[in-house]
Amino acid sequence: MQTALRTSLPETELASRASFAPHARVVREERVVQASGLPLSIRGLRKSFGDNEVLRGIDLHIPAGQFVAIVGKSGCGKSTLLRLIAGLDKIDAGTISLGSDVQPEDIRVMFQEPRLLPWARVLANVEVGLGRDRASKDAHARAEKALTEVGLADKRDQWPSVLSGGQKQRVALGRALVSRPRVLAFDEPLGALDALTRISMQRLLERVWRDQGFTAILVTHDVSEAVALADRVLVIEEGRIAHDVVVNAARPRERGSVELAGLEGSILSHLLSADDRT
C-alpha cells in the first residue's frame, strides 16, 4: 500500500505503516469513521543512519486524542521520530503500537511544504488525501466538506499557483483531514509562513483537533507555538526524551499570557543549558 501511494504522489501526507495491511477492510466505501484518536505506545525505539545513532531508546506513551509537541535543536531526532511513527522510515529496534483495527488512512502527515499537484485544482488536490477511497461515490462531497473545515470552500476550482502560502497550507491540511485520520502528524507545517498567517493557522489546527478528536503530534522549532497548542511538550536531546512538560493552561489559550510565557521560558532554559553542556 505504502509503495503504491508513493508512486502516485511522492512524499505526501499519505503515510501508512506496513503492518496495517493485514487489517485492511475489503469494503472501502462503507468504512465507519472513527471519532476519536488512537493511543500511541513506543518502547525502546532506536534509529541510525550509517554510524549516526539518531534515536537512542525512546520510550513514550501518548493517550488517544492528546496533542503532543516535540521540540529540540536541529539534528536531535524529532523529525526522525515523527517519520517512524508515520511509517515513512523503517525502525532499527524497538516497537511502535497504535491500538487495534488500524487502517492505512488512520495516519496522515502534514509537512512544511504543501506539495500540491500543480496540474490539479484545489478540490482534486484534497481528494488525493482519500487514497484508495478516491473513486468512491462521496469523494467530491467529502473533499468539499474538508475544504469548508479549513475555510477554503470558495477556492475549490482554483489552481494552486494562484493561492497564497497560507492558503496552500490550508489545502494541505484539508487533504490530510479528508480521510478523517485518527493520528495527524505535523512536521514543521507552519515554518515558512509569516507571523500573522502562522497564528491564524495555529488557531485552525487547534480548532480542527478539538472538533475531530484525533491524536496530534507536532514537530516544531517554535517553543511558543508548542506551548500554545499542545497538552504536552517533549524536549528531544541527543536522541532521547530529556524533558516532558505538561501544559495545563485552559483552552482557548491566550497567546503571550504569563502562564504560557513561564512554560516557554522553562523549556528554552532547558534547551539553552543543553547547548552549554555540549
Curated annotation (Swiss-Prot):
Top EC category: translocase
Entry membrane topology: Peripheral membrane protein
Signal peptide: none
Entries under Gene3D superfamilies matching the protein: P-loop containing nucleotide triphosphate hydrolases
Gene Ontology CC annotations of this record: plasma membrane
Claim: Phosphoprotein is one of the keywords in the record: no
Chief location bin: membrane
Key words of the record: ATP-binding, Cell inner membrane, Cell membrane, Membrane, Nucleotide-binding, Translocase, Transport
Domain of life: Bacteria
UniProt catalytic activity: ATP + H2O + aliphatic sulfonate-[sulfonate-binding protein]Side 1 = ADP + phosphate + aliphatic sulfonateSide 2 + [sulfonate-binding protein]Side 1
PANTHER family: ALIPHATIC SULFONATES IMPORT ATP-BINDING PROTEIN SSUB, TAURINE IMPORT ATP-BINDING PROTEIN-RELATED
Entry function: Part of the ABC transporter complex SsuABC involved in aliphatic sulfonates import. Responsible for energy coupling to the transport system.
Subunit relationships: The complex is composed of two ATP-binding proteins (SsuB), two transmembrane proteins (SsuC) and a solute-binding protein (SsuA).
Similarity remark: Belongs to the ABC transporter superfamily. Aliphatic sulfonates importer (TC 3.A.1.17.2) family.
Name used for this protein in its record: Aliphatic sulfonates import ATP-binding protein SsuB
Organism: Bradyrhizobium diazoefficiens (strain JCM 10833 / BCRC 13528 / IAM 13628 / NBRC 14792 / USDA 110)
